[in-house]
Amino acid sequence: MVKAILGYDIEPGMTVEEYERWLREEHLPDLKRIPGLRRVVFNTVKGIVRGETTFYRIAELHYDHMAAFERAAKWRAQNPVSFKRGPEGKTAFRFYVVCETEEIEFDV
């Protein structure tokens, strides 16, 4: 599995309520259209253990493999969303990385 992992804050001037409404009513339906995107996970940050960097949220976009991510990236470049629907002016990205995932489960 491959995950695109994004850390971000909400742009100044936008309330949490406005952001969440935009995210769920406009942005999520657009994400759902992306070929190969299997799952989206939102991790709302409640505290920082080390360092001073803060984030509103860490998001994960799940793909089956790197080729699926690359096809999705190409599709997104060919099918851009409008400014109103896209994250510009709403989402202040702090990082955006693509990771190959290894999950280890423990018996409890």
Question: What annotation goes with each model-predicted range?
Answer:
Residues 1-108:
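Macromolecular interaction modules
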